[in-house]
Design a protein with these regions (language model features):
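Exposed, low-structure sequence patches enriched in small/polar residues
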Residues: 1-191
């Protein structure tokens, strides 16, 4: 007998262009999502993105319409437990150079947690926290001036969902983002 209640394999390929049909980096990703009989889920994802033009950083500034960026790759692991009747929780970790659809110069790593408590069918409370750190985060400042930084971003989201029957729902969310960018260095783009 198997421990799994469901298993999904996903293979994605993305070929992207800008609005002028200039080719941008393409990406390939593979995801394995396994749901166990005890209502826990484990998700594993890996991706690869080719090197190439990135026009999102400079927003197509006329003197520097794009930046040539290196290839990217990485992985993500997520675990979710929904076995409790009144609570569920999730934990995740990712380490990657860029993202599946966004380029980056350096590595970033992040971990996140979610806890949700449902004391009754009509109300639930949740709290989410993520801590992301990135080396050589590239930021466009102005004109042809770019810089790299050591970036840290912490995100906290608290929420309350209230349901009355099938027709009414009230959602309240509070979000706090703490962002730091330290050790700035000038960056000369090769485009």
């Amino acid at each position: 007998s198997s421990f799994s209640r469901e298993r999904n394999y996903t293979l994605d390929y993305a070929l992207m262009t800008d609005t002028d049909w200039n080719k941008e980096p393409s990406s390939l990703s593979m995801t394995l999502d396994n749901g166990f009989k005890n209502f826990t889920d484990l998700k594993l994802k890996t991706f690869y993105r080719t090197s190439g033009r990135d026009n999102q950083i400079t927003r197509k500034y006329k003197d520097s319409p794009y930046i040539n960026m290196p290839k990217g790759y990485g992985y993500e692991v997520n675990y979710m437990n929904m076995s409790g009747k009144k609570y569920k929780y999730m934990a995740g970790f990712m380490r990657r150079k860029g993202e599946e659809y966004m380029s980056a110069l350096g590595w970033n790593k992040a971990y996140d947690f979610l806890f949700e408590y449902t004391p009754a069918d009509s109300i639930s409370y949740s709290i989410f926290y993520q801590d992301l750190r990135e080396k050589n985060w590239l930021n466009w400042l102005e004109n042809n001036l770019l810089g790299t930084y050591e970036k840290r971003q912490r995100l906290t989201v608290a929420g309350i969902n209230w349901f009355k029957g099938d027709k009414h729902e009230l959602r309240l969310k509070a979000q706090m983002v703490a962002f730091t960018a330290r050790t700035p260095k000038a960056y000369l783009a090769n485009n």
